[in-house]
Amino acid sequence: MAVTNTPELIEADRLSYYAISKIEAQFIYKEIFTDHCYDIANLPSNPFIVDAGANIGLFSLYMKRKYPQAKILAFEPAPVCYDVLSRNLALNDALSGVKALQCGLSSSAGTLPLTYFPNLPGNSTLVPEEKNKLYEEAVRKRGKETADERFGGAVKVDVELKRLSDVLREYYPDGKPDQGLERIDLLKVDVEGAELEVLKGVDEEHWELVRNVVVETWEPSGIRPQIEALLEDKGFDITRDRAEWAPDQFSMITARRQD
C-alpha cells in the first residue's frame, strides 16, 4: 500500500502523539480530550475497555490517562494507522495496559478490502459507499478542490476481520476472572459504517458482561435504529446525542446497563 504521509509528532496538553493527518488528529483530540465525547459516569478505577476502531490511539491514551489501571483491548485494521497506534502507545508508556491488535471487528471472521484515505485516515472504511456520499457533500459545501484534497489518493488494502467474542475467548479463555474478564466496562465502537456488524460479533455470554456501549453513527446510513434496537434487546437503556459540528449527520449512541 503506497502512502506518502509521514507521521508528524504533535505536542498537546502534556500529551505527545504521532499523527498521519495533523488536522484530522487535532479534531479527534478535541472531541475526546476537550469535549469528553466518550466520558461515561461510574466506571470503576480499573475498567476493562474494548476500543473498536482505535485509529492512532487517542481514545486509548485518553482512557489510560483518566484510568491508569485500565486494561484496553484495541483493534485497528489499517496497517498505517496500526503502526502509528503502536508508536503512540510506546511513546506514552501505555504498552503494559493496552493490547493492540491489527485487525478489524465484524459479525464473521474473514478478509475484506478497506478503503484507506491517506489524508483522512480516521475515515478509512469497509463501507466506501458512505464516504462517496460524504465526498459529494464536501464538493457541494467546500468545492471540488478541497474535497479532492481530503478524500483523494484512496487505496484499497485487504484487512483481517475477527469476531469480538472469538478474540475474547482467545485471550480470556472461559472468562476466568483472574484473567481480567469479570466484566467489559465499556465497548467503544467507531468503525466508519461497520458498527452494526461489530455488535453482531458479540455472543450472549459476552453481552452479559458489557456494562456500557458508545457507538458513533452516520445518520444517512439508516442503521442507527437497528443498532438501538439491538442494544435495547440486550437490556441497555439508550440515549442519543447529535454531534455539535454536524447535528444532522452524526449521532453518538450511549447504552448503559442498569444494575
Curated annotation (Swiss-Prot):
GO MF entries: methyltransferase activity
Keyword terms, alphabetized: Antibiotic biosynthesis, Methyltransferase, Transferase
Gene3D superfamilies per record: Vaccinia Virus protein VP39
GO biological process: antibiotic biosynthetic process; methylation
Disulfide cross-links: none
Pathway: Antibiotic biosynthesis
Keyword Methyltransferase tagged: yes
EC number(s) per entry: 2.1.1.-
Family that this chain belongs to: Belongs to the FkbM methyltransferase family.
Summary of the function given for this chain in its UniProt record: Methyltransferase; part of the gene cluster that mediates the biosynthesis of sordarin and hypoxysordarin, glycoside antibiotics with a unique tetracyclic diterpene aglycone structure. First, the geranylgeranyl diphosphate synthase sdnC constructs GGDP from farnesyl diphosphate and isopentenyl diphosphate. The diterpene cyclase sdnA then catalyzes the cyclization of GGDP to afford cycloaraneosene.
Protein name, as recorded: Methyltransferase sdnD
Organism, scientific name: Sordaria araneosa
Gene name for this UniProt entry: sdnD
